[in-house]
Structure formats: structure tokens, C-alpha cells
Amino acid sequence: MTNIRKTHPLTKIINNSFIDLPAPSNISAWWNFGSLLGICLIIQILTGLFLAMHYTSDTATAFSSVTHICRDVNYGWIIRYMHANGASMFFICLFLHVGRGLYYGSYMFTETWNIGIILLFAVMATAFMGYVLPWGQMSFWGATVITNLLSAIPYIGTNLVEWIWGGFSVDKATLTRFFAFHFILPFIISALAAVHLLFLHETGSNNPSGIPSDSDKIPFHPYYTIKDILGALLLILMLMLLVLFTPDLLGDPDNYIPANPLNTPPHIKPEWYFLFAYAILRSIPNKLGGVLALILSILVLAIIPLLHTSKQRSMMFRPLSQCLFWLLVADLLTLTWIGGQPVEHPFIIIGQLASILYFMILLVLMPIISIIENNMLKW
């Protein structure tokens, strides 16, 4: 009798994706982040569902409904903080996952890579709208500033912004629709993640050496299931350390002040995971230019496969490219720091230089260094 696991239409899909999947024998811990992102998404959907049971998306009661969740609902405080810090863990895993793709040349799977970029945009949109929901000062002013950027679009800008707001400012209509979108997007993200996996399984996983591993494959289960469980335990440990010891470490104290359209906070800034893009936005004095730079800071990932000039796929054996990669990481950390600073003398120029360097590394230096490495190897 043939195994039902391999024949039943439903279990067959699971079997071919997570059990009998042929995987390279040498993939490192950097390949754990895909499954960790899946776990993050599940945590966010579950905690978000329970929060939505008690949350009210009306300007008069939104802030107090979040307070009510934390004070009166059984374990509401832990659900709320798991959701807020779960978003931070989600973005840490996302950045490491994208960084792994850049380092090891995984972007050569163009379909998988492009779906990944769409996923990144979708998760960023979801996180932004989620930050508006508690209706604190940063929620309100963050929503005002970021949606207002769309007014930089020529001709239709102002109409577009007012259409998104549902009025002449961020108000009831805006909050209600943001809640609706924030609820639906994670399910769209789940579907996109399935497509992301579908395309990945067409080619199989890449590996640290960047060399095809068809001659040396091992089954996903038990080798990588147990490895993923270890990764999941470490992820949950880190999340719970944040939630139970320093739940407000990554948040902004201003968001504990109810939204007030008449009082602007001294420093309007987004959550930490958007600061690098916010710094790039602010480093350009022109409004439309800043918006374009902001979008391009993520969209630039889409042309990386076209700029791959090296004869090798991975950076494992390319020390010069490695130096550039880590310079890029340092540059992104610098941008993250600058994004949280006020617009004053030293920070403005540092932000502008870091922004220029970011695009220079990705668009100019990486392809040139790759060609130099090819020539050094007489290829």
C-alpha cells in the first residue's frame, strides 16, 4: 500500500514542500529565516485576531480600547506586546533574509526574488497602518506625514491624498479604513508567501557556495525540520525576552499620549525599522525627489539581478565584494541612526552622504568590483 502522505492531494503538497523536499546538504543558519518569517506571520495573525476582538476603530474610542486591552482583558497586555514586538522581530528576520539573498546571490532566482520584494512592500504597508491604529500622537502624526507624501505626485497628488484620508485631514474615516486594510493585508501576504515558496521549489534552494547542489541533496525532514525548530525556539525566546522585560524598548513614548491634531510632537519619526528609508527621504530637499528616493531605496533591489557582473554567484569566495557588502550594512545602520535624529547640522550632511553611498554601493561599486574580481582571477 502506498503511503497516504505521498498520495493524498492535500498531504502530497505538504510532503513535497516540508518532508521529502530535496535540500542542499550545506545550507547554513542564514537559510533559517524563511521559516522564521512564516512563524512571525502566524504569530502576528493570531495575536492580531485576538486584539481585533477588543479593539474599536473609532477616533473617540481607539486609544481607550487599547488601554482597555492592556488593563482589563485577560492576558491582553501580553497579546498587545507580542503583536507590537512581533512586528520588530518580523522586520529583523526580513532584513537578515534579504541580506542573505544579497550576499549569497539568491537573487538570481528572479521570480522568487521579485515576489519577495512585493512581500517586503506589503509587510511595510501593513506595519505602517498597524502603527496608526492605537491613535497615539505618533500614530496620528506619522499617518499625516507619510500619507501627505503622496501630494508630491504631480497633478493628482492633492486629490489622491484627500481620497486616501476620506476627508481633509487624517480622521475617523482614515482610521477605519486603515484598520480594514491592516486586517486584510496579512492574508494577502500569506498567499504571496505561498507563491514565493512555489517559485522557490521550481528551482530548489541556493547554498552558501553558490554552486549547483543537485549532486548532493538531503531530505528536508528530519535534517532541516529540527534545525528550523531550533531557530523557532531562539526566535520565540528573543521575542518573549523583549515582551516580558522591556516591552516598550523599541516603541515611542509619544504614542502613550492620545492623538491631538492641535499639538505636534517635537520629533516625528516612524518605528525603528523604517528609519533607514525615512533618513533617505529626508536627505533630499525636494519633496517629490525625496518620495522617489524613498520608493527606490527598496525598489533598487529589483534591478540587482541585472547588475550581477561576477562569474561567481555567491560572495563566499569574493573578499572585495564582501568588504562592500559589510560597508552597505554599516551604511544602513548609519541611516537608521540618522533617521531617528533631529534635522540639524551634523546629521543632515551625514544622512545625505550615507544615502548617496547606499545607492552608489548597490548600483555602481558592486558591479565594478565584481568585474575587477573576475579579472583578478583571469576569468
Curated annotation (Swiss-Prot):
UniProt-listed InterPro entries: Cyt_b/b6_C, Cyt_b/b6_C_sf, Cyt_b/b6_N, Cytb/b6-like_sf, Cytochrome_b, Cytochrome_b_C_euk/bac, Cytochrome_b_N_euk/bac, Di-haem_cyt_TM
Superkingdom: Eukaryota
Annotated residues for binding of heme b b562: 83, 182
Binding positions for heme b b566 per the UniProt entry: 97, 196
GO BP terms: mitochondrial electron transport, ubiquinol to cytochrome c
GO cellular component: mitochondrial inner membrane; respiratory chain complex III
Named cofactor requirement(s): heme b
Record's function text: Component of the ubiquinol-cytochrome c reductase complex (complex III or cytochrome b-c1 complex) that is part of the mitochondrial respiratory chain. The b-c1 complex mediates electron transfer from ubiquinol to cytochrome c. Contributes to the generation of a proton gradient across the mitochondrial membrane that is then used for ATP synthesis.
Full protein name: Cytochrome b
